């Protein structure tokens, strides 16, 4: 009677899952696209490295375990500091990176990247709370700021045509990537969606696809009619087998775009936000051009003419009310001039 442990049946012993095991359960049960799962796994590995870092560096913490029930806003601040400076710890504590490696050497994380990481950690904690894995809600007292972005810059139709008509016969490989870039400016998809396209995505003189990024919510088929330029480009590559166009790796595509802009003489200065310092800096557009500029060019130029976000997002595959899409509203000086002229 006085020895209750004698009556405690072995199956009642509850072994508490580690944060890694909980994270795996979250990834299995929470509806996420493959792309987002990959992003969450990056955060999971960083959390496990944080655990090892605390054990290695903090006095009396050799047995430290990151326990969802015990994380406080102070823990989150310490984690933020670790995430921010992790690129320095890579060389100081190599054993941590041998235990939980990354493909790429850690680089300084910008504030937007840190905000993204901690938004994912918050999503994980809310899932743990909603699924009765913890009663702890450390993010209630740890607010996360919104990401800061500059106003999107894009190329004008005149600049696009200059690139389309540039003589790149001396560099045939660049000429192919130029055609792909122009095609992307005419259908406005993300590069990940472009690279999955085959001839089967061409349906009744339009491109049809389901954006990968919105797949996990409610998949929507985006249909973008092909204009004459887009048809002309597809005609050039109709003999090409396999994918829709001769794609190369995304990194090489981005490098090619910069060279193409320079050769075509598209060199106007644009203002961008430095991702690490958040200071405005001026750069020639060919230094910062990338595949995403093709998407912005499609959206920006249509938005300028149509000014109806719902119509444009039907073509761009943005979710309704997307924060990314809102940035296009403060995009165009001419539009602002048109509006104030109404008051003349």
Place the predicted regions along the sequence by residue.
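Short, charged phosphate-coordinating catalytic segments
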Residues: 126-136, 184-206
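Conserved tyrosine-mediated DNA breakage-rejoining catalytic core shared by Y-recombinases
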Residues: 187, 196-235
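A short, basic/aromatic helix-end/turn motif that makes direct DNA contacts
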Residues: 196-202, 303-305, 313-320, 327-331
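Conserved catalytic core of the tyrosine transesterase superfamily
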Residues: 111, 168-182, 305
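N-terminal core-binding DNA-recognition domain of tyrosine recombinases/integrases
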Residues: 24-35, 44-151, 166
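Short, basic (Lys/Arg/His-rich) helix/loop patches that form interaction surfaces
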Residues: 169-171, 239-243, 258-314, 318
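N-terminal helical hairpins
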Residues: 1-32
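Catalytic-site neighborhood detector that most strongly recognizes the C-terminal catalytic loop/helix
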Residues: 213-215, 250-253, 316-341
């Amino acid at each position: 009677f006085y020895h209750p442990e004698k009556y405690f049946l072995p199956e009642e012993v509850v072994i508490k899952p580690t944060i890694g095991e909980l994270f795996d359960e979250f990834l299995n049960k929470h509806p996420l696209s493959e792309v987002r799962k990959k992003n969450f796994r990056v955060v999971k590995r960083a959390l496990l490295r944080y655990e090892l870092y605390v054990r290695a560096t903090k006095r009396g913490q050799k047995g430290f375990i990151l326990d969802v029930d015990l994380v406080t806003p102070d823990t989150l601040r310490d984690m933020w500091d670790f995430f921010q400076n992790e690129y320095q710890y890579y060389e100081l504590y190599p054993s941590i990176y041998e235990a939980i490696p990354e493909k790429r050497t850690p680089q300084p994380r910008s504030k937007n990247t840190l905000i993204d990481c901690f938004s994912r950690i918050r999503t994980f904690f809310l899932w743990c709370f909603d699924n009765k894995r913890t009663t702890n809600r450390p993010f209630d007292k740890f607010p996360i700021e919104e990401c800061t972005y500059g106003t999107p810059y894009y190329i004008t139709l005149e600049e696009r045509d200059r690139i389309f008509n540039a003589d790149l016969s001396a560099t045939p490989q660049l000429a192919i990537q130029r055609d792909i870039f122009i095609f992307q400016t005419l259908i406005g998809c993300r590069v990940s969606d472009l690279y999955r396209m085959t001839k089967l995505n061409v349906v009744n003189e339009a491109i049809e696809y389901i954006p990968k990024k919105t797949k996990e919510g409610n998949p929507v088929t985006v249909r973008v009619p092909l204009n004459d330029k887009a048809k002309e480009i597809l005609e050039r590559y109709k003999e090409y087998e396999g994918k829709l166009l001769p794609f190369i790796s995304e990194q090489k595509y981005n490098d090619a775009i910069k060279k193409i802009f320079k050769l075509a003489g598209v060199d106007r200065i644009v203002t961008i936000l430095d991702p690490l310092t958040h200071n405005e800096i001026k750069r020639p557009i060919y230094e910062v051009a990338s595949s995403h500029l093709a998407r912005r060019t499609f959206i920006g130029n249509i938005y300028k003419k149509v000014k109806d976000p719902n119509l444009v997002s039907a073509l761009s595959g943005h979710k309704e009310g997307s924060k990314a899409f809102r940035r296009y509203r403060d995009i165009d000086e001419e539009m602002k001039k048109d509006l104030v002229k109404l008051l003349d």
